[in-house]
């Protein structure tokens, strides 16, 4: 049982294959309120750039694009998710506003002072080096611009995982 739990947990950090797709759908449902609040909080213009760390299947990116029509950038460690996020965001891609990469937030491949906003939902738990990741985000964010990081508390996760309630 421990191996199965560990395997499924790893899928939330690096979704791959059919199980990874299912995990992303579950995340889309569980994180829906976070997505809505994140989109509402991000205040950008269509000529600005936003970076989403851990874009998964592109669900949040699509919501951001639908509201702001901004340039969308994303970095995720999952090759499979790049494919899914690209197909989910065809409209932004056709407009030349979708720029997805496979990689790690601890080594962001962007110039300093590039983004007007950076978002991340429930990914910080999986970063290889939290301090380095935060430092990289600070480097690529324009001065005074926000980093939106939404996470669940340990207590909330325990309610969901162990008591089966949301």
Language-model regions, residue ranges each:
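Conserved class I S-adenosyl-L-methionine
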Residues: 146-166
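Conserved alpha-helix/loop element of class I SAM-dependent methyltransferases that forms part
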Residues: 29-48
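A short glycine-rich, Lys/Arg-flanked "PGG" loop and its adjoining helix->strand segment in the class I
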Residues: 131-143
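A short acidic, Gly/Pro-enriched loop at the edge of an enzyme's catalytic core
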Residues: 106-117
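A short SAM/SAH-binding and catalytic strip from SAM-dependent methyltransferases
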Residues: 116-129
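Class I SAM-dependent methyltransferase Rossmann-like catalytic core
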Residues: 16-30
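N-terminal, positively charged/glycine-rich alpha-helical extensions of SAM-dependent methyltransferases
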Residues: 1-19
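Class I SAM-dependent methyltransferase SAM/SAH-binding core
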Residues: 51-107
């Amino acid at each position: 049982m421990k191996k199965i739990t560990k395997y499924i947990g790893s899928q939330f950090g690096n979704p791959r294959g059919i199980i990874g797709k299912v995990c992303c759908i579950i995340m889309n449902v569980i994180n829906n309120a976070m997505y809505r609040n994140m989109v509402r909080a991000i205040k950008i213009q269509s000529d600005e750039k936003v970076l989403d760390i851990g874009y998964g299947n592109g669900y949040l990116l699509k919501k951001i694009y639908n509201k702001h029509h901004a340039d969308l950038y994303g970095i995720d460690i999952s090759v499979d998710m790049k494919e899914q996020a690209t197909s989910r965001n065809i409209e932004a891609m056709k407009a030349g506003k979708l720029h997805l990469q496979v990689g790690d937030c601890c080594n962001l491949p962007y110039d300093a002072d590039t983004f007007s906003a950076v978002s991340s939902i429930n990914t910080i738990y999986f970063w290889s080096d939290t301090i380095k990741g935060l430092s990289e985000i600070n480097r690529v964010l324009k001065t005074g611009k926000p980093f939106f990081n939404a996470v669940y508390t340990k207590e909330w996760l325990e309610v969901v995982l162990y008591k089966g309630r949301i």
